[in-house]
UniProtKB/Swiss-Prot annotation:
Entry binding sites for ATP: G106, S107, T108, G109, S110, G111, K112, T113
Disulfide bonds: none
Coiled coil: 354-395, 424-454
Swiss-Prot/TrEMBL GO biological process terms: microtubule-based movement
Location of region: Disordered: 664-684
Protein name (Swiss-Prot/TrEMBL): Kinesin-like protein KIN-8B
Record has Disulfide bond as a keyword: no
Residue ranges occupied by any Kinesin motor domain in the UniProt entry: 14-349
Gene (name only): KIN8B
Entry GO MF terms: ATP binding; ATP hydrolysis activity; microtubule binding; microtubule motor activity
Family according to the record: Belongs to the TRAFAC class myosin-kinesin ATPase superfamily. Kinesin family. KIN-8 subfamily.
Protein source organism: Oryza sativa subsp. japonica
GO CC field: cytoplasm; kinesin complex; microtubule
Keyword terms of this UniProt record: ATP-binding, Coiled coil, Microtubule, Motor protein, Nucleotide-binding
Cited PANTHER family: CENTROMERE PROTEIN E, KINESIN-LIKE PROTEIN
């Protein structure tokens, strides 16, 4: 029997920013001056490093002195334990099913790795965090059982490696519609004590790429992410509720200048890749900080694998702490101010936190069987590969075979990278176009509101605010169009490289003696490209399904907002011969404020439709419907009353006289608004290619369907979503 309850409530949290200043080193004490002052544990002052300025320049405010305020500021004498005291509450939520992210940000040599990893006498935030988790699990007096697992990866030169595997290959990122960004093939180890995680942490750190530079004798050349997952479930009960909390502890590599490090060769290339990924992170921080002021700014997560991994921590379902590490030396002034500048912008970032609640059911056993079968298949393939390698090693023309195999491996790797790059570019372009679509929808509403306001009062403050907001949206659209042009150019270059690789394969097939093998390789790679491109469509479909679940939850809120309880709804449905697909509603009356919950598996059932209940009056209060990116207010018989409509994700307000999507005759006014979807059991609507959105532009997965109408004379509700018209009889249309 389906349960009816509200979805997990979301809380908005602001990214917490702490600044930690390390002491001067022995060499810095001889050649540098201390320029950092900490005031009241929340304010930091960076003094002007130039002491040669005269009095006139100082009184004319020609100084480089900078002042910043943060949640917490730690002087050079503070230990890692002092930092951890103020962020431990964030870590404790992981045991309750919440996500948390802690990352250290700063230039090379500023103390990031020391802060995150620490030493035996001064343990870092990583060590203190997993000790807290196991202490909380041990002290828990409930009957719940806990399962703790951890993984450890690094991002080196835009390639992901597993630090818990002795000889890890290249790992790829995958997007899961439920769990978000995941690393395919990453090893996750179950642990039962903090000492075991510490052992794994030491093993991973020994495999991490580090080099000695003039700026830092133990410079980290990669970004490292330690992820701890805590699953909490009731003991001995099948089908019980499961809470899944995740803690991500990130030690970033430091930005550096080639002129300061005097690097060359591989070290120089490593530094360039580090700076490129950190620049992508800085751009994401800028865009997220700008969203509260300028609205729908595109966030370029796909410009780097690091930013894709940190996506949840920066703007998704996570409570996040950023520890900015700085050096007090005067010759590090520019690095220090740059770090504090981005940390100051990060204070504006907001995340949306909710518990990760799941239920165990029969699908789990199916997945386990599939995994077991795949593991058996992988073992067989590894065995066959070892036999083939042995056969190659005993051939008389061993050197020639090795050269051919090396060439094939390089070609295979380049082809895979080309396909993955094209997927990321196409997804990024799709996301950017969706952002611009919403911008243009808001621009249309603003133009309508400005036109109405000009008729009333041309000099009002409301008109000025609307005009200013309109200019901000136009700037966002222009910036996004420029970014889109850059993505299209990159896609063209990627396609050109794809053709080059195909030509190389065809040439080798025609010239090499082993033509059959190369022909098979060519066909395999071409099929691999096709399969990878189909994954894009699958990811889009997953997003469609997720959006549809949210729409159905909103529809239940609308139904209960009319004043009907579950018993009344069941009676109305029975009179019209309407039932829920699967099984009927229970007779007991739930809280009218709670919509039904749906299983995370399956095709978004159950669906319902009801006739308009004439006997039930509509609630006189406004019904605010949270849907996607907007909140719409429906007021019965007040269609011409000016209403303040609010775009919640933009924190912007503007006047609209026709917020209701229906006119006096009961006909819908679409105005680009997405509407709920209902269907009858006799003619259920297909969910194929359905996506809540607007009719202003078509999406890549939009599809035309024939128009259908209700036959019994009731008022019609036309639903247009991404050029997909659907007609159905609902009680919402008669309100």
């Amino acid at each position: 029997m389906p349960s009816i309850r509200a979805p997990a409530s979301k809380q908005t949290a602001t990214l917490q920013v702490a600044v930690k200043c390390r002491p001067l080193t022995d060499s810095e004490q001889r050649r540098s001056r201390h320029i950092i002052q900490v005031i009241d544990d929340k304010n930091v002052v960076v003094l002007d490093p130039d002491l040669s300025k005269d009095y006139l320049e100082l009184i004319q405010n020609r100084t480089k002195e900078r002042r910043y305020s943060f949640d917490h500021v730690y002087a050079p004498g503070c230990s890692n334990a002092d930092v951890y005291k103020n962020i431990s509450s964030t870590i404790a939520g992981v045991v309750q099913g919440l996500n948390a992210t802690v990352f250290a940000y700063g230039s090379t040599g500023s103390g990031k790795t020391y802060t995150m990893v620490g030493t035996h006498s001064d343990p870092g935030l990583m060590v203190l965090s997993f000790r807290t988790i196991f202490d909380l699990v041990k002290k828990d007096d409930s009957k719940d059982t806990f399962e703790v697992s951890c993984s450890y990866l690094e991002v080196y030169n835009e390639v992901i490696y597993d630090l818990l595997e002795k000889s890890s290959g290249h790992l790829e990122l995958r997007e899961d519609p439920v769990h978000g960004i995941m690393v395919a093939g990453l090893r996750s180890i179950k642990v039962h004590s903090a000492d075991k995680i510490l052992e794994l942490l030491n093993i991973g750190n020994s495999r991490r790429k580090t080099e000695s530079t003039e700026a830092n004798s133990t410079s980290s050349r990669s970004h490292a992410v330690l992820e701890i997952t805590v699953k909490r479930k009731q003991k001995g009960q099948y089908g019980s509720q499961v809470l899944r909390g995740k803690l991500a502890l990130v030690d970033l590599a430091g930005s550096e200048r080639a002129s300061e490090t005097n690097n060359f060769g591989q070290k120089l290339r490593d530094g360039a890749n580090i700076n490129r990924s950190l620049l992508a992170l800085a751009n994401c921080i800028n865009a997220l900080g700008k969203q509260n002021k300028k609205g729908l700014a595109y966030v370029p997560y796909r410009n780097s694998k690091l930013t894709r991994i940190l996506k949840d921590g920066l703007s998704g379902n996570s409570r996040t702490v950023m520890v900015a590490t700085i050096s007090p030396a005067d010759d590090q002034y520019h690095h220090t101010t740059n770090t504090l500048k981005y940390a100051d912008r990060a204070k504006e970032i907001k995340t949306h936190v909710h518990k990760n609640i799941g239920h165990l059911d029969t699908h789990v056993e199916d997945y386990k069987r599939m995994i077991d079968n795949l593991q058996v298949e992988v073992s067989q393939l590894k065995k066959e590969l070892a036999e083939k390698e042995h056969q190659l090693s005993v051939k008389p023309t061993e050197k020639a075979a090795d050269n051919e195999l090396s060439w094939l491996n390089i070609l295979s790797q380049e082809t895979g990278e080309n396909v993955q790059e094209r997927i990321n570019l196409q997804k990024a372009l799709f996301e950017l176009e969706e952002t611009n679509k919403r911008n243009r929808m808001e621009l249309q509403h603003l133009d309508d509101a400005i036109a109405r306001q000009q008729v009333k009062d041309k000099d009002s403050a409301v008109l000025q605010a609307l005009t200013s907001r309109r200019q901000v949206i136009l700037d966002n659209i222009r910036d996004n169009d420029e970014a889109g042009a850059g993505y299209r150019k990159d896609i063209e270059l990627n396609e050109s490289r794809k053709r080059q690789l195909q030509d190389m394969i065809e040439e080798a097939t025609s010239n090499n003696g082993n033509r059959t093998y190369l022909h098979i390789l060519s066909q395999y790679r071409l099929l691999g490209m096709t399969n990878a491109e189909l994954q894009i469509e699958m990811a889009m479909r997953d997003q469609v399904i997720y959006n549809q679940r949210e729409s159905l939850r909103s529809l239940w809120n609308i139904i209960y907002g009319t004043g009907l309880n579950q018993k009344q709804i069941s009676k109305l449905a029975a009179k019209q011969g309407l039932t829920i697909e699967g099984c009927p509603l229970p007779v007991s009356s739930p809280d009218v404020t709670t919509p039904p919950s749906f299983s995370p598996h399956g095709r978004l059932s159950p669906f319902m439709s009801f006739p308009s209940p004439q006997s039930q009056p509509y609630s006189p209060s406004a019904c605010f419907v949270q849907h996607g990116f907007s909140t719409m207010s429906y007021l019965r018989n007040q269609h011409e009353t000016p209403t303040v409509c609010r775009q919640e994700h933009l924190s912007s307000y503007y006047m609209m006289s026709e917020c209701s999507p229906f006119d006096g005759d009961g006909k819908q006014k679409t105005n680009g608004r997405s509407m709920p979807y209902f269907s009858t059991p006799g003619k259920p609507k297909e969910m194929y290619n359905f996506s809540p959105g607007t009719e202003s532009e078509r999406t890549p997965c939009s599809k035309e369907y024939p128009t259908s109408y209700s036959r019994n004379g009731d008022s019609l509700v036309q639903i247009k979503v991404n050029s997909l018209p659907l007609y159905t009889k609902t009680m919402i249309g008669n309100l």
